[in-house]
């Protein structure tokens, strides 16, 4: 394991924190306009798409710095999306439970796949 200068570690923590601040505030804002299951589904699908873009950008292009990917994924996307709210809302709405679980997972996986295709398109048809 390589030694990392303490300022680099502090910078990384600050970047993740700023990403988390932005993601959680956007999550709150989305919830104001789309309360309940709809808002949770929307942020989780958008987050799946965004994470798919980040992962496949790293695999196929590699233009983003590791700090940028960390701030975007661990900071922003992880605070924007919400598995715990998804679980609670599913339990609290038994009439929608199966549809919510199946729909959330199907759309989440679709979001990742669309993210992959967007990267392929912009990367010039890479792998």
Curated annotation (Swiss-Prot):
Catalyzed reactions: fluoride(in) = fluoride(out)
Biological processes per GO annotation: cellular detoxification of fluoride
Keywords: Cell membrane, Ion channel, Ion transport, Membrane, Transmembrane, Transmembrane helix, Transport
InterPro entries: FluC (IPR003691)
Membrane topology category: Multi-pass membrane protein
MF-aspect GO terms: fluoride channel activity
GO cellular component, one term: plasma membrane
Localization per Swiss-Prot or TrEMBL: Cell membrane
Pfam families found in the cross-reference section: CRCB
Annotated function: Fluoride-specific ion channel. Important for reducing fluoride concentration in the cell, thus reducing its toxicity.
Name of protein: Fluoride-specific ion channel FluC 1
Organism annotation: Haloarcula marismortui (strain ATCC 43049 / DSM 3752 / JCM 8966 / VKM B-1809)
